[in-house]
Amino acid sequence: MPRANEIKKGMVLNYNGKLLIVKDIDIQSPTARGAATLYKMRFSDVRTGLKVEERFKGDDIVDTVTLSRRGVDFSYVDGNEYVFMDKEDYTPYTFTKDQIEEELLFMPEGGMPDMQVLTWDGQLLVLELPQTVDLEIVETAPGIKGASASARNKPATLSTGLVIQVPEYLSAGEKIRIHIEERRYMGRAD
């Protein structure tokens, strides 16, 4: 089993009976002699979606779990269920609207590339989205002529219903790139 200092973002740990996906790691090196380096890890509970934060010493042994990652494409909606199809063997994976409520805010109508499902022991756990997505602004205050890139921000409603802060110079109808995890504007889409 690996030590805490060998854990990387995206790995899955079995900790206190919970499956936790590593979302972020902060390394804190104490200045006192003989003190151990601390690893503050932020997780997402695979089953509940709740955020969890834990601290480990560098030489603490942790239990990792290997999940199966499968590339999927969005297929169709059946009432309250969203069906995704495996890209290789066409296995359907079904999520309820409640299970992927957060992910739906970033998913354009026809789906998006690079989506994956995570499974463990044949059990469907999580729909994982890529880091960024391009979405269209459907509603925002009109763009201000002469507004610079470093100007103030304004709220914008995107095609999926998500509301984020964007620079003042953007207007409705423009496609922008969003960082999914941080829910922030990154720039205009290519």
Curated annotation (Swiss-Prot):
InterPro entries: Elong-fact-P_C (IPR015365), NA-bd_OB-fold (IPR012340), Rib_uL2_dom2 (IPR014722), Transl_elong_fac_P/YeiP (IPR020599), Transl_elong_KOW-like (IPR013185), Transl_elong_p-like_YeiP (IPR011897), Transl_elong_P/YeiP_cen (IPR001059), Transl_elong_P/YeiP_CS (IPR013852). Coiled coil: none annotated. Signal peptide: none annotated. One of its GO terms (cellular component) is cytosol. CDD domains: S1_EF-P_repeat_1, S1_EF-P_repeat_2. Gene3D superfamilies: 2.30.30.30, Nucleic acid-binding proteins. One of its GO terms (molecular function) is translation elongation factor activity. GO terms for biological process: peptide biosynthetic process. It holds the Pfam family EFP. Belongs to the elongation factor P family. This is Elongation factor P-like protein. The lineage of its organism: Bacteria, Pseudomonadati, Pseudomonadota, Gammaproteobacteria, Enterobacterales.
